[in-house]
């Protein structure tokens, strides 16, 4: 018999066996932890498979083999005896989502069925995790049926390369890691890190060439990851306006373009064209447009007779038209219209519904609705709790006006040196993802602002949280997510508690922030203010320094003990990890760096009291 007939017979047998056992469904052994959590897992009695049992990959006619993981890619594509991995495209008895799939495990093998190659890819990624757990913990994968699909169609993370670039190899590995956790998009804030060919003066010396970026985007596309550019415009334009003084709104500031100078658009459109050519497979062009501080103040703008807000929205219409004409959907940060309307601070607040109801007023937005391009996606960014009353009201306003909205949470908000805090901000990722799913918004983006220069490895738990909660926002709480993250990333079982050190490290870095100052803020990210450093001991007046800084010394002693606890936790984690030791090494050096103020304070105390 030809292979296609054999496969059909095998699929029929497996399906009948599965149906016969469906009356006896049970729960999945806790040693198998899938991330993201599938929508439905049914487990049945009977013999399953071990990670070594699969002997080949077979496809139905017209079904491609997607990019496979390490444990399945080694399997031959020719049918042979034994248990196989069977792949088939079908529109029957599968989820409606193009990324959905059904995965069946039986003693005959594994079947993955999906509508599209993307669904097959994700089904095989889920199988890869099952095989890993079978290998790592010596357990048989039980007979089961997984029916799975995403709650949110567009699940993106943000790359902010304003301040530094990693090696290209790192970005390839990043794509693999994102795909593993079913993140399907990247919005890349390029700044000057693309080698612009139309405006070569803009690119930094270490910028990525368009050809290098095209190759990376092609690699990502094969793994169902779509990369789109973010090219800042109107504001945040220092990387451009340091070269083009003639386009500044304020000659003393490189922050904003003049939106009334036609040459502004000549430069911006050239940069857009280069970015679109470098990233040819994305659907979006993010045009920035946030945090404008002063437009409408020079003679070119005054001559138009337009207000600052009107000038901003005229700019937005022009850049949106460009995006649409070039086959992209424009995205725009939405803070400036909210500031114009006087509701920005309210949207950021956590005021109760009763408090919000008394002051909520969108009349200025209502009057200006004709200025809002309908083709634009308004990126509603809120980096902490997104479920507040004012925020929900704003989302309803967008919906009522027929405007498209995408959510933006933060895996790194840019305000923390060393690393993001609060469980790598995963609770905020979860909360906004749930809101996006409930309101059927255009998608969700986990931003990763680099202002505080955290090592990107310290942001990854937040990225993986976006994979988890963008796919299935409600299945797990944060504690359960952290345990599954530890297993998937490092091979630690939940009862090992091997990542507890990370909770302690997040606490420790708070002391670093203010350890050496008595007033003000010296946080190396945004928010720096005038500050006063602690003084030095006076050898002519021993003990006075220690008395003055008694509280800091007491806290430093606590943090010294915490440092040792963290160091021991990392040492054990490195010894027992099955993978990703590099991330643990980054945490180790982060711990050493954040401990510097502790050691300095204790050394000064020793000197003062010697």
Model-derived features with residue positions:
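Substrate-binding cleft of carbohydrate-active enzyme catalytic domains
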Residues: 151-336, 342-354, 377-379
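Short, Φ-rich (hydrophobic/aromatic) sequence segments
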Residues: 38, 67-74, 124-131, 170-177, ...
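Extracytoplasmic/secreted envelope proteins and their assembly/folding machinery
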Residues: 65-68, 117, 121-124, 128, ...
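N-terminal small/glycine-rich loop or linker at the start of catalytic domains
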Residues: 143-162, 406-415
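Substrate-binding groove of N-acetylhexosamine-processing glycoside hydrolases
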Residues: 28, 34-37, 41-44, 59, ...
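Contiguous, structured surface segment used for ligand recognition
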Residues: 26-154, 247
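Positively charged n-region of N-terminal signal peptides that target proteins for export
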Residues: 1-12
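Bacterial N-terminal signal peptides
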Residues: 12-20
